[in-house]
Every structure is written in C-alpha cells, then in structure tokens.
Amino acid sequence: MRTTLFLFLVWLQSSVALPSLQAASHSLFDGKTFAGWEGDTNQWWRIEKGNIVGGSLVRTIPENQFLATTRDYTNFVLKLEFRLTGTNGFINSGVQIRSQRVPKSSEMSGYQCDIGDPTWWGSIYDESRRNKLMAQSDMAALNKVLKRGDWNHYEIRAEGRRIRTFINGAQGVDYTEADASLPQWGKLGIQIHGGGKAEAHFRKLSIQELP
C-alpha cells in the first residue's frame, strides 16, 4: 500500500510540474516598430495598420527581401497570419526558420516554409543552401482551406529534426531532416520574393519555445 501511494504521489508531482517546462507563447511583433527585427525597412519593409508589409504592387522587386529576427531560435511553435497579393510576375513569399543571414546580401540561408501558387503553399524549400524543394505539401488538403488573396493562418512546428507546417489547420508537410550536419537553430524571417509586383502582409506573429 505504501509503495502504491508513493508511486501515485511521484506521478502526481511530475504531472503538476510538467506544464512549467513549457514556455508561454509571446508576440514577435509589437505592431508599431521593427524592434527585434532587421532588414531593408527604408525601401521594402514597412508597417501599415499594425501589420508588417513587404514588397510593392507598383514596382518590380529586383531580388528576394527578408525581414529577419535579431535572435536565434531552436525548437518552437511559430504562429502567424499572412496575406499574399500581386499584380505581375512571380508572386511568392515564405517564412524562414533555423536560418542565417547571407553576408553582404539581402538573402537568408536555411529552411523556408513557402507561400504561393501553384503548389508552394506549406512546402519546405532549402533557401540559398541546397536550393531545392525538400518536402512537397499536400495540396489536395490545403486547397480545401486556402483563402488566396485573403488572410490565412500559418503554424510551423520545429522539434528536433522534425518540421511540420499547417495552413488554416490543414497539414502541409511532415519533414524530418536526414543530414545531421545541418544546424537546427537560427533566425526566423519573412520574405517577399524578387521578380514580381507583389505584397506580403503579416500579423499576429507569436512563438512558443519548446525544450
């Protein structure tokens, strides 16, 4: 009886203590300033009505532009809302995770959780590193929930070498990195792709860091 009671108390204590290991979610954007972020805020990134906006609908964006966090993250649940619109050329955006700035360039190097037609939504592309698609999203599932030209919810879960993407609750990919040499930490970033007249809007950016 004493052994059973002891084991129960140990289980109860561990169950109560477990939530304290999970960090609370916090906002990445204050809605007013670029505090905690860096990029070309003189030309390609701005704040409008409490949202981050990248790009232009009247000028062709000559090269990829990224707004990046000033600190690194490893394991996390990242949530945000995005809206992608465009008038001409390649209309595309994305969210960088576990990435690095490329010296003397506007680029970032690392995993990009993509945004855009025809089938980039929710896919993972290795930006400025392996330069190839690492995981194609389930477009059959995403097409049922996507709101093109309107606001969509993006959730990205990075845990160990596993990365999962969700758009409006539907899973895009479940990818596990096979190359043990690649860093599983780095900066976050949001992109407006070069080669088009397009705008990417972002709001409600928050992150919950995981152990």
Protein language model regions, located:
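Carbohydrate-interacting regions of secretory-pathway proteins
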Residues: 21-211
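Bacterial N-terminal signal peptides
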Residues: 6-17
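Positively charged n-region of N-terminal signal peptides that target proteins for export
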Residues: 1-4
